[in-house]
Amino acid sequence: MMTAVAIRPERLRDHIAAALGARLRQITLALEEVTVVLAAADYFDAMRVLRDDPVCRFEQLIDLCAVDYSTYADAVQQGPRYCVVAHLLSVSLNQRLRVKVFCPDDDFPLLPSVCGLWNSANWYEREAFDLFGILFDGHDDLRRILTDYGFIGHPFRKDFPLSGHVQMRYDAELRRVVYEPVSIEPREITPRIIREDHYADPH
């Protein structure tokens, strides 16, 4: 089913603006993609509207990830550090939407879980917790999903050291895996050099 809203994303933008009302912080249309920015306090209710509204009807959450804006485009980001970005899909109406919400507290990033709206949010939110340390209130099983249980820190934060904090290895005497401080010595990262095409051709 192809609707006029799907064909003309500006109509989707205008309808979402009307449907969300005061819950909407910002809405933009670029490259035929609609992006909305929500406040953390309005996040869950607004997402429910986007799922249930008959002109939106976003039945699927197809992705949810996080961004650390502490440094961005070689500049210090003004405002909150952590942002969660969700991508919604309406299969029945053939339209998509990007939703951004910033965590209000950099030291304790916390947002409501949307697992109650879309089951697919379960592992996405666990990944955002594991890699960025963002907590999701109401998630029934918020534990690490990619790193191991003894992992220290959140590796996608921009202040996380490249070498990590600890390493693990098999200890033959103890006959088990052990954790120990990382033994990699810091070294200067050499930038990759890409030469122009045909630089070695004879003149």
Curated annotation (Swiss-Prot):
Entry keyword annotation includes NAD: yes
Enzyme class, spelled out: translocase
Keyword tags: Cell inner membrane, Cell membrane, Membrane, NAD, Quinone, Translocase, Transport, Ubiquinone
Gene Ontology MF annotations: NADH dehydrogenase (ubiquinone) activity; NADH:ubiquinone reductase (non-electrogenic) activity; quinone binding
Membrane topology: Peripheral membrane protein
GO cellular component, one term: plasma membrane
Stored PROSITE patterns: COMPLEX1_30K
One Pfam family, short name: Complex1_30kDa
Protein localization: Cell inner membrane
Catalytic activity annotation: a quinone + NADH + 5 H(+)(in) = a quinol + NAD(+) + 4 H(+)(out)
EC number(s) on file: 7.1.1.-
Family statement drawn from the similarity comment of this UniProt entry: Belongs to the complex I 30 kDa subunit family.
PANTHER family, sorted: NADH DEHYDROGENASE [UBIQUINONE] IRON-SULFUR PROTEIN 3, MITOCHONDRIAL, NADH DEHYDROGENASE UBIQUINONE IRON-SULFUR PROTEIN 3
Function: NDH-1 shuttles electrons from NADH, via FMN and iron-sulfur (Fe-S) centers, to quinones in the respiratory chain. The immediate electron acceptor for the enzyme in this species is believed to be ubiquinone. Couples the redox reaction to proton translocation (for every two electrons transferred, four hydrogen ions are translocated across the cytoplasmic membrane), and thus conserves the redox energy in a proton gradient.
HAMAP family found in the cross-reference section: NDH1_NuoC (MF_01357)
Oligomer and partners: NDH-1 is composed of 14 different subunits. Subunits NuoB, C, D, E, F, and G constitute the peripheral sector of the complex.
Protein name, UniProt field: NADH-quinone oxidoreductase subunit C
Organism per entry: Verminephrobacter eiseniae (strain EF01-2)
